[in-house]
């Protein structure tokens, strides 16, 4: 017999399972099996991944799932470029996960308290990996507290150093936007993403992509979590890929169906095209902010196109109140946890989503109008002054 509500699942069954109601997509349905297969195929395509797992929750759930699967009792290393790579340390400490954690912090480029920041030099990272021989290295592709990105060349050298000592490289791509990372060419072993930024979806899960090397390694590991058991969620996805289904905990089926739809929309538009849009929009917004006197927190060569973080001395820009008053939801500045000076004060602008990327002129104009209204007009100075 057909489902009562055709808008949920036109080809669905009458709902009498013990998991869902008629108003939700059943995880055992043919429609949801197709959703999972489509998501997996697209993720494997764009990231050149070998395997995919979806962990219900948010990107941080994926971070913790990876840590509890691969880092228990191990010596690990974290490339910390700000507050959201400090999150690895918070996860480790809360769960008493690794036996030792070595942190390589981003550094300011001069003694000027408003100078730009860059990640630990790749030469130092390589030397530390060779000396310490960590089992796992954790790095942020884009650090949202600093607007800092690690280049493919940087990542490739990190992965080569990690592999030389037999370790794995984990890359947090939750805030990467449309700056897709090719796991095969960069050597990334485990890549973590989420729906709500680069994929223009609603938050509902973490996407964890594994290389062939990591897929082999996970079979020798045991998670210290039940709900965030990454190996179990990998098995769930592999069951869907095989044309069947499996249950661990209840999945956000309707949100995943919506995610699949927007992933297919992005795929049809073109991953390379949307990446170029991300690059161009980021450059335009950075140029705008510098023209109004706002210095970038991230140094040249490390400036992310999807997250722009700038210095300010205005407390109501820092806490986003001035933007809110003009109808814009920006993000307040946060600490870096990288030994920054006491007067460190920033604000953050996110440039995520197809609506912004497909309409760069409109996106920039919204920000320019807000800055005009605040009184931050274009300046003639060659070098940006402090705002």
Pin down the residues of each PLM region:
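Conserved active-site segment immediately N-terminal to the catalytic lysine
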Residues: 184-196, 206
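Conserved N-terminal alpha-helix of the aminotransferase class I/II PLP-enzyme fold
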Residues: 17-62, 86-87, 91
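Active-site C-terminal subdomain of aminotransferase-like
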Residues: 196-291, 355
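PLP-dependent enzyme catalytic core of the Aspartate aminotransferase-like
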Residues: 2, 341-387
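Active-site phosphate-binding strand-loop segment of PLP-dependent enzymes
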Residues: 111-177, 190
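Conserved C-terminal alpha-helix-loop-beta "cap" of PLP-dependent enzymes
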Residues: 290-362
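PLP-dependent aminotransferase-like
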Residues: 61, 71-135
